[in-house]
Amino acid sequence: MKHNGMNVMNSNHEKTDASQGRLRGRCSVHLVILSLFLAACLPVAAADSARSRCIILADMGNEPDEEQQMAHMLVNCNEFDLEGLIAVTGKFLRPESKEEYRRVLHPELFHKLIDGYAKVLPNLKLHAKHWPGADYLRSVVCEGQKGYGIADTGPGKSSPGSRLILAALAKDDPRPIWVVVNAGANTLAQALIDYRASHTAAEVDALVAKLRVFENGAQDNSGAWICAQFPKIRWIRSNYQTYAYGGPGGRDGNKREYLGPNFWQPHPYSSAGQHAWLKEHVQTGHGALGEIYPDRQFGKGKIEFMEGGGTVPWLGLVNKGLFDIDQPSWGGWSGRFTAEKVKNFWSRHADIKPDEEKVAPFHVHREVSDVWTNPETGEVLHGDYVPVWRWRLAMYANQIARFDWCVKPFNEANHHPVAAFNGDTSDSILRLNAKPGEKLTFDAGASTDPDGDKLIFAWWHYQEAGTYAGRVFVEGADSAKANAHIPSGAGGTQIHLILEVRDENPIASLRDYRRVVVDVASLDAAQFTPIK
């Protein structure tokens, strides 16, 4: 995240930008190497193309968590290009629902939230750039298929939502589209059906190659059908991590409500405690958008954990220096998944699985587990939720800061620091070549904070994201300058190092990240050529 305030600018940051010629799309890395090898640095993506395109499908009106998720999304939408907000059906909102309200689509709820966004937009512009206009957002709201599942697709059944998806894919824009499926996927299925009906197989493959789909919970039978019919599609299916922003809920071994690591203190460890946190940081005194951010409560029943399952799927797009939509196994705020697709990872919903069995085999990227130590408690956590939980403290701080931006002047709010890697202040993920046994020296000393806050540095090895099974020692891991010691047995593997820069601020400690991907040469390589 690179946030440049519109009325206050850090002078050191300006000087750094000037001296670096606004390094975007490349970097010059000066590494101290103890052998004759000089490692070279290459950004994975140029900064101009690092902004992702995004279309969100959601069953608005099913329950209040959809409105929570989308209000939260709107205070982050300057970080990606939002090209569609499509109201769709799913398992819980469909014509067959018992409750009349849940039998029809509710795109008007998108408009309600955009109206709130419009009122706080002038203040948001004081804190960061690239906010879309409210009228533009209204123009990309539409309805998808009105019926449930793959049965409501086929010739002559196109919808405004399916046509919007095709129009986005037809744009002269080489960037892929991150499609968030926060309910059923039949509107996306209809778009693909319509395109296949009038195009060659090669053209269909080219269109499918532009899609990156994150399916939240497999909430209808269309996802498996799409993956079976279009086997080259890049499709992430999350049955667990998608719920890890505030959950997963349920009960632990002591029969208590279990919500993962508690970063909403001093409020109670419960869903109600989370909502007390939301009342403090979102719903009260944070402008028109916060005022319409609802509680996740069903009628007069129990309050459930905040934001349900639809926040994690889009949240990774906020950190371009950490998250790569083409690399599901690398991890980030949207979780971590298998590098290769796996066969028949079924929906978590028992009533959907029988339909999926009829179209099997199909292949998707499924979630994988991490091991992480909670820095607040020292508790070691392992499991499928951990690839999201490990970022939770930073994600919650980001939410606090951004809802503050809705009402506060620049000098009363906090803003994200800018992490620099060897002088490069872009948003790019970086790649290095190295040899086994190398010592690589990194420097984050050019990192800045727009508020002049003290910066705290952390360099760490994200073991699960790479292919080297051992540990990588980082000397000076809590300093601006650090040395990474590439193990002698790491030949032919990939190592992921994370630079995490956070500010010291009483409002909330915000973070910026840079991922450094080190490709280690094989020991038997006849000649090692650095990346040019």
Where are these regions (language model features)?
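N-terminal secretory signal peptides that target proteins for export/translocation
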Residues: 1-26
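Bacterial N-terminal signal peptides
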Residues: 29-40
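N-terminal acidic, glycine/proline-rich low-complexity segments
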Residues: 47-441, 447-454, 458-468, 483
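Solvent-exposed segments in extracellular or luminal domains encompassing
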Residues: 476-492
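Short, solvent-exposed loop/turn segments at the edges of extracellular beta-sandwich modules
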Residues: 502-509
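Extracellular and select intracellular beta-sandwich modules with Ser/Thr-enriched
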Residues: 509-516
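Extracellular interdomain linker/stem segments of modular secreted and single-pass surface proteins
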Residues: 519-527
